[in-house]
């Protein structure tokens, strides 16, 4: 599938520390096996690091065979490193490719000189060549990079799997009722597609016929199958369960959920965090450090031993053993793995800095409705306070105004009125009163739906005892006003989510204080907070109040994470150190929010914190390994322990260098969410 291939390609390109590297990763496997054919005769016909074995695979003119094969190997097998080094120098960011290119170039050029001295010069004595080292160096480098690229690819494997979820074709239901198999790219918005049991749903859409259960585990991380009926949304890439359904297409191509997720993740992987910028800088300095140590070691050994072969071997070993690459990949590989795992589990990381900031969070502020509670209200009590209006008339007036709103409280009232067969009308001039409720005209009379705060602020009389009784039972209470008089009320209960209590306990165990922010009344807020174990509660808030509360907490030096609705809580999410938009569903492109939680599950807040902790731990491990390896390996390669007989050959240096990067990649791949 084209999309999948493009995503896979982008994943590699994002590691721009090794641009020369990325251009050639597809060739490493082929180049390794072709180079092996050239390298075997070179290795057999060359003295092993200057040591003559009891048996020799040589014949008259064999040195010419070695020269010709080494030249082919240098330009063919060494091409990724030579052109990669050239790219790095062109961008003024010399790194690992440049070091390897320098190492094999020095080995090859000096070997040409040795060949000339041994075959055409009248000078006595044998000049040692480096053709054996050159062949083994190039082979080991190609093998190491092939293994590494597999590991790098696996780091973003979850994302690649997501890209492969969409099928290549779909069954389109034509206007005449005929079915026709068409390519996914030919599907348009508003087309009807048919999906049989067990098939992958080709696009985002709405079920227009049939009912089924859907497996969304690979798309949103939702482990249980989700029951879907007519008018329910489905996500492209999820698996249809038991029934055949017809789906009206709502989004295709880049507008689809999966494409948006992969786009956001790719963007996050390409953005550099402060830790990554630092490691890039250190990796850049490492090139100059390695070249300097290599040149100094060459000069020092020439002065000590006056042996150009040994001194040159030290120089080449230093150049090939230094690995800025291990340092350069330390963070991007963990990031690729982390963001992919997150996306696979319905946690979209938009801002990578938030993963680092999450280690220092002091407070998590949460909206009550929909975050801590289900947001599925049930009407528990409704009452008229006016003798000439029945209770059902009050319900009808509430439902008329609320029919124009998509707030959970409004939807609950309208559904309840329908279930009671209470009719209601379409109101005129309905306006939202921010943080309070609604107002509008019904039969040319103005009605307002408000909360208790509004009544208190404006001096309205109401039954306070009834309010306290219902509120302490956990009800949200709305009042209906006509002609400056409270004429009725409605009380709605909400259920606390099962996972909320565990989430609060987990936060407290991490020394993070949970804070409830809600527009609901004090009594309801404290009743819910008490049940959950939250002691810090702010109730009866206007939308702008939440932002100022976050600002107050931050002014004392605290780091604040805000969890809320990506649209209604946008200012608060932007103000917080980390903004988490919860329950985004397929609308993952919400502008506000550093992290987007597809589901409305509070336990995903803990999953994000766990993923952040695990990610940072892997980053630190990789940085220590990347830096520590170079601190130890470069002086060893220079011959600092030669006096006790510990000398590393260029081939051993190349093996260690390749291993160092592979270890970083494997460590990144072991990152888990749990």
Swiss-Prot record:
It comes from the Bacteria. Signal peptide: none annotated. It is a multi-pass membrane protein. The keyword Transmembrane helix applies. Residues 1-22 are annotated as: Disordered. Its EC number is 7.2.2.8. It catalyses: Cu(+)(in) + ATP + H2O = Cu(+)(out) + ADP + phosphate + H(+). InterPro entries: ATPase_P-typ_cyto_dom_N, ATPase_P-typ_P_site, ATPase_P-typ_TM_dom_sf, ATPase_P-typ_transduc_dom_A_sf, HAD-like_sf, HAD_sf, P-typ_ATPase_IB, P_typ_ATPase. Keywords: ATP-binding, Cell membrane, Copper, Copper transport, Ion transport, Magnesium, Membrane, Metal-binding, Nucleotide-binding, Phosphoprotein, Translocase, Transmembrane, Transmembrane helix, Transport. Coiled coil: none annotated. The active site is at residue 367. It is an enzyme of class 7 (translocase). The keyword Repressor does not apply. Belongs to the cation transport ATPase (P-type) (TC 3.A.3) family. Type IB subfamily. Involved in copper transport. This is Probable copper-transporting P-type ATPase B. The gene is copB.
């Amino acid at each position: 599938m084209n999309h999948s291939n493009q995503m896979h390609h982008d994943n590699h390109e994002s590691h721009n520390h090794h641009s020369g590297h990325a251009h050639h990763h597809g060739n490493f496997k082929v180049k390794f096996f072709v180079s092996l054919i050239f390298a075997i005769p070179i290795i057999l016909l060359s003295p092993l690091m200057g040591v003559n074995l009891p048996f020799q695979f040589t014949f008259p003119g064999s040195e010419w065979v070695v020269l010709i094969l080494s030249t082919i190997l240098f330009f063919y097998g060494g091409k990724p490193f030579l052109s990669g080094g050239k790219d790095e120098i062109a961008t003024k960011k010399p790194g690992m490719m440049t070091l390897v290119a320098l190492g094999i170039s020095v080995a090859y050029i000096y070997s040409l000189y040795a060949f000339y001295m041994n075959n055409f010069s009248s000078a006595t004595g044998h000049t040692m060549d480096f053709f054996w080292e050159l062949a083994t160096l190039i082979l080991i480098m190609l093998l190491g990079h092939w293994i590494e690229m597999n590991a790098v690819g696996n780091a973003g494997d979850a994302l690649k799997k997501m890209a492969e979820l969409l099928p290549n074709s779909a069954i389109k239901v034509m206007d005449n009722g005929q079915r026709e198999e068409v390519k996914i790219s030919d599907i348009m918005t508003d087309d009807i597609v048919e999906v049989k049991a067990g098939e992958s749903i080709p696009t985002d859409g709405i079920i227009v016929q049939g009912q089924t259960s859907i497996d969304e585990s690979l798309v949103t991380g939702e482990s249980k199958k989700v029951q879907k009926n007519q008018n329910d949304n489905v996500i492209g890439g999820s698996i249809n369960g038991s029934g055949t359904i017809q789906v009206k297409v709502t989004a295709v191509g880049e507008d689809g959920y999966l494409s948006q997720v992969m786009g956001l993740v790719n963007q996050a992987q390409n953005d550099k965090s402060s830790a990554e910028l630092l490691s890039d800088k250190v990796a850049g300095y490492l090139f100059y450090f390695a070249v300097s140590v290599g040149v100094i070691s060459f000069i020092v050994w020439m002065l000590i031993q006056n042996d150009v072969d040994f001194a040159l071997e030290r120089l080449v070993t230093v150049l090939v053993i230094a690995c800025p690459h291990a340092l350069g990949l330390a963070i991007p590989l963990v990031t690729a793995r982390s963001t992919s795992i997150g996306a696979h589990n319905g946690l979209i990381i938009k801002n990578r800095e938030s993963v680092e900031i999450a280690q220092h969070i002091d407070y998590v502020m949460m909206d009550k409705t929909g975050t801590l509670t289900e947001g599925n209200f049930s009407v528990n009590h409704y009452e008229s306070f006016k003798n000439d209006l029945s209770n059902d008339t009050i319900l009808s007036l509430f439902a008329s105004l609320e029919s124009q709103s998509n707030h959970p409280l409004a939807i609950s009232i309208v559904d309840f009125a329908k279930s009671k067969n209470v009719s209601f009308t379409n109101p005129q001039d309905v306006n939202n009163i921010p943080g309070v409720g609604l107002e509008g005209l019904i039969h040319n009379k103005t009605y307002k739906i408000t909360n208790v705060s509004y009544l208190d602020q404006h001096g309205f009389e109401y039954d306070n005892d009834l309010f306290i009784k219902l509120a302490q039972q956990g009800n949200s209470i709305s009042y209906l006003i006509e002609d400056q008089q409270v004429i009725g009320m409605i009380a709605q209960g909400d259920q606390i989510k099962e996972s909320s209590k565990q989430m609060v306990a987990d936060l407290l165990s991490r020394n993070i204080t949970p804070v409830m922010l809600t527009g609901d009344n004090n009594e309801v807020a404290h009743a819910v907070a008490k049940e959950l174990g939250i002691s810090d509660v702010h109730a009866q808030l206007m939308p702008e109040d939440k932002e100022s509360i976050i600002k107050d907490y931050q002014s004392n030096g605290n780091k604040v994470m805000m969890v809320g609705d990506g649209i209604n809580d946008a200012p608060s999410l932007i103000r917080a150190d980390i903004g988490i938009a919860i329950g985004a569903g397929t609308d993952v492109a919400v502008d506000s929010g550093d992290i987007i939680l597809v589901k409305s599950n509070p336990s995903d807040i803990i999953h994000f914190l766990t993923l952040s902790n695990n990610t940072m731990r892997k980053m630190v491990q990789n940085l220590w390994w990347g830096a520590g390896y170079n601190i130890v390996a470069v002086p060893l390669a220079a011959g600092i322990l030669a006096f006790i007989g510990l000398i590393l050959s260029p081939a051993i240096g190349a093996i260690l260098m390749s291993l160092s990067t592979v270890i970083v990649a494997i460590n990144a791949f072991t990152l888990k969410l749990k």
